[in-house]
């Protein structure tokens, strides 16, 4: 089930024991604690498949403890971290270390991806199979694409041997290295160096040839252009073994948000044109885009309050992911089931997690939210240690009320 409305649920020993209209409250043992969710929607806990955890190395921006608190506030029960920590997650020992720390302090479930190449340098393949055996759910070079096609081909072939997942940040680095925003008349007017939109589809097109050759599982992060949506739609019709996601900025904002040199709207990939934004929504509507992720990228104030071309990329997103996705429901672009599928079932399937669904005898990872509750986004109230959001002051509808992980109430508003 993708959600429950007006039904009861029983949780016992951290598992979903039963759910449905047939449950009579007056017949439930007094040993159960009763929680009133009248007027609320119970959904599977959100699965966020692209998160920068920052620990180890940049704990002043985020820690495993702070990120898990931020996640549960946003209704996220499972999050998948990218490998670009310091040191880089390119060996099993680092995965084991993060998982051990997560078991000690995290409220949510935290999973790792490993880097495709050693130290994210794009040259030498890392210990992929050993990381896979240690729990890595996939392999990515984080915020970089691998420029050398021979290296990428070796990675595809290697990962195929154990049915692993390649995750791509699709940007041709030779076209993006000097740019800081989408290349357009807006970048020209602002006097900022632009990144051409086709830097994204060029890498996707290249990688699709490797998918055709190897049939390796391939996932594309934060799709942002109409051209990429068109290519992915065609590739899926061809039957290629691919999936993709996007993030709220790419269906909520466009390049005009960079006006006045707003560094909090400086993202990677950059915010695109209005036509691109509308194409992302169409991709979500027709199922071309499988999942929605927060793309949570914490940055401290000093890293953002610089001239635009010097400021760091990225925005936090754990605590706004649900509400911004529900805006697609309120604006009649998606129905509630489509929206929740992008946040729960689909990412869980892509990363082979036993979550993202309401099912008997499975972990009670649940999000209880009010679809119509209005609130104003205020980063000063975030649990995240970083406050860099382009949505500061935005009035949204839909708010998480309670979060359960393995049947335990870990957040309540």
List the model feature ranges, each with a label.
Residues 1-6, 10-11:
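Single conserved hydrophobic/aromatic residue that forms the stacking wall/gate
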Residues 14, 39, 50, 71, ...:
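Divalent metal-coordination and catalytic microenvironments
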Residues 38-104:
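Metal-associated gating/positioning segment near the N- to mid-region
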Residues 43, 92-109, 157-168, 320, ...:
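Alpha-helix-loop-beta-strand connector modules within alpha/beta enzyme cores
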Residues 189-217, 264, 285-292, 297-371:
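His/Asp/Glu-enriched, well-ordered alpha-helical/loop segment
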Residues 307-310, 363-413:
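C-terminal cap of metal-dependent C-N hydrolases
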